[in-house]
């Protein structure tokens, strides 16, 4: 995601910095922004402002050695490796605010990482709260921190809880994959095409009947 105000990628860092218990349980890994880009473009300038805020938070909360800041990845293989890393370390993936959601769900499901998601701007039926992930609001840090702490505490007390949430993502694979989406789209396209063809066949007869109706009831 872009490291700008809208995506709120500095939010997880601020949440973790304010909540000591969360820092004990997990280190944030932030994948955002183009670290090597310099531009006077308005959008790029805003992203540079995001970097300044991120570095400021890292200094303020003394995160050096406890955070990983990685440039946004265009390489799908490398993205898959990042998701796999989350899975291998029994971590949680937090969806950026206003970020395209369904594709991330599919990718995350492939490696079975437990997933948190931002609540107000995504369809709630994709992630069932407490079943296949957690509903969080990225703009309410105190509440989010408590949700994440509770999740990791449960995982530490019962390691099978992480697997339970992860396995809950099976419903995503059953209902929201691109394969299912494309199959449904093709089915609906075929149905529409047939309906359109039949409608054209009936159009002449309908006009003929309408003519007699107009003559009888002027």
From Swiss-Prot:
One of its GO terms (biological process) is sucrose metabolic process. It catalyses: an NDP-alpha-D-glucose + D-fructose = a ribonucleoside 5'-diphosphate + sucrose + H(+). Disulfide bonds: none annotated. It is an enzyme of class 2 (transferase). Its EC number is 2.4.1.13. Signal peptide: none annotated. Keywords: Glycosyltransferase, Transferase. GO terms for molecular function: sucrose synthase activity. It comes from the Eukaryota. SUPFAM superfamilies: UDP-Glycosyltransferase/glycogen phosphorylase. Belongs to the glycosyltransferase 1 family. Plant sucrose synthase subfamily. Sucrose-cleaving enzyme that provides UDP-glucose and fructose for various metabolic pathways. This is Sucrose synthase.
